[in-house]
Every structure is written in structure tokens, then in C-alpha cells.
């Protein structure tokens, strides 16, 4: 189903670029994703209900999403017609990936053993942008006492691990190779 969601996201992304609505559509899609992310199971039930017609699913879209961008509404109609309303979170994720790629930015999760100061965060973000060659990094911070010290950054599939725990694991591996 991820491939299906990617196709919807790509179509919406292309339309948003062609019509100079990329920012608006991204913002509205973010709000929609937040609104439905806890309702995916209910949406799956709507998708799988054989007694519900496409028109009824469209009415549901109209009732819930009254004042949204017409391109998003059209995509939602297509999702409803094809019994894919529950894919909206996957569509959002794929759209976000295209959006981030367009602007050469990505999300980063910075883990540390304590709450980092703004100065420390700025230094880490600068390091991450240099290492990943991204224009912008959107940061989410988490406290992880298992790191013992230092920090670990996850950007997409890349992990930059400057934690004491990682140093100890690396040291342990070296000792095992020697013995």
C-alpha cells in the first residue's frame, strides 16, 4: 500500500508545484494528518465497509474537510472512490519526503542524556548540516539516558553517533577482535 500512497503523494506534489501551491498544500496536509493520525483504524473500517458507496464516502470527506484546498479535496475524493481513505497518513509521509527533497531539508532526531541548551543544539545542527549537506534540518529532541553521555542524531537513514555508549560498544568490538 505504500506504493499506492507514493503515487497519490507524487500526483499531489506535482500539482502543487505546477500551481505554485506547494507551501499551502504542505501546511494543509500537515493539519489533516494531525487530525486523522489517531483515526486510521476507523478509516480502515470505512474503506472496507461493503455497504458504503463511493458517494457516501465522498459525503464523509465533505463533512469532515469543509474548507480545504481543492487539490487536496480532489485527492481525498480519489482516495474515497478507491477505498484508500485510510492511506492519508502514508500519503502525507510520502508527500513530506518529496517536499523535504525539493527544499534539501530533512527531519533529525537528536538524542542526549539531558536537555540540550540552545547553543548546544545550534552546534549539533551545524555539524549535521555539514555532514549531510542538507540546507535545513528540522529538529526533534529526545532524552535517552541509555547513551551514558554525548549525543546521537538520526537523519533519515543516517545515524551520527557521538555517544559514550557507542564508544564503549566500539571498544568492546575491538577487544573481541584482538582475543
Swiss-Prot record:
Chain segments annotated as coiled-coil in the UniProt record: none
InterPro entries on file: ATP_synth_OSCP/delta_N_sf (IPR026015), ATPase_OSCP/d_CS (IPR020781), ATPase_OSCP/dsu (IPR000711)
Pfam families: OSCP
Keyword match Thylakoid: no
Bilayer topology annotation: Peripheral membrane protein
Cellular location(s): Cell membrane
Repeat listed as a keyword: no
Gene3D superfamilies: N-terminal domain of the delta subunit of the F1F0-ATP synthase
Example of a GO cellular component annotation carried by this entry: proton-transporting ATP synthase complex
Gene Ontology MF: a single term: proton-transporting ATP synthase activity, rotational mechanism
Main location as per UniProt: membrane
UniProt KW keywords: ATP synthesis, Cell membrane, CF(1), Hydrogen ion transport, Ion transport, Membrane, Transport
Family of this protein: Belongs to the ATPase delta chain family.
Subunit structure comment from the entry: F-type ATPases have 2 components, F(1) - the catalytic core - and F(0) - the membrane proton channel. F(1) has five subunits: alpha(3), beta(3), gamma(1), delta(1), epsilon(1). F(0) has three main subunits: a(1), b(2) and c(10-14). The alpha and beta chains form an alternating ring which encloses part of the gamma chain. F(1) is attached to F(0) by a central stalk formed by the gamma and epsilon chains, while a peripheral stalk is formed by the delta and b chains.
General function of this protein: F(1)F(0) ATP synthase produces ATP from ADP in the presence of a proton or sodium gradient. F-type ATPases consist of two structural domains, F(1) containing the extramembraneous catalytic core and F(0) containing the membrane proton channel, linked together by a central stalk and a peripheral stalk. During catalysis, ATP synthesis in the catalytic domain of F(1) is coupled via a rotary mechanism of the central stalk subunits to proton translocation. This protein is part of the stalk that links CF(0) to CF(1). It either transmits conformational changes from CF(0) to CF(1) or is implicated in proton conduction.
Protein name listed in UniProt: ATP synthase subunit delta
Gene: atpH
Amino acid at each position: 500500500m505504500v506504493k499506492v500512497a507514493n503515487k497519490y503523494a507524487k500526483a499531489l506534489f506535482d500539482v502543487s508545484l505546477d500551481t505554485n501551491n506547494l507551501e499551502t498544500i504542505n501546511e494543509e496536509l500537515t493539519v489533516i494528518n494531525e487530525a486523522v493520525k489517531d483515526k486510521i483504524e476507523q478509516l480502515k473500517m470505512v474503506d472496507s465497509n461493503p455497504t458504503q458507496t463511493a458517494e457516501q464516502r465522498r459525503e464523509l470527506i465533505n463533512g469532515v474537510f469543509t474548507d480545504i484546498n481543492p487539490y487536496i479535496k480532489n485527492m481525498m475524493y480519489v482516495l474515497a472512490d478507491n477505498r484508500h481513505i485510510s492511506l492519508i497518513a502514508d500519503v502525507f509521509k510520502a508527500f513530506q519526503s518529496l517536499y523535504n527533497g525539493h527544499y534539501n531539508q530533512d527531519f533529525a532526531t537528536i538524542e542526549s542524556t539531558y536537555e540540550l541548551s540552545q547553543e548546544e543544539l545550534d552546534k549539533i545542527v551545524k555539524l549535521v548540516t555539514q555532514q549531510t549537506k542538507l540546507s535545513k534540518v528540522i529538529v526533534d529532541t529526545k532524552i535517552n539516558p541509555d547513551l551514558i553521555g554525548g549525543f546521537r542524531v538520526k537523519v533519515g537513514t543516517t545515524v551520527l553517533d557521538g555517544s559514550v555508549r557507542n564508544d564503549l560498544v566500539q571498544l568492546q568490538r575491538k577487544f573481541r577482535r584482538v582475543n
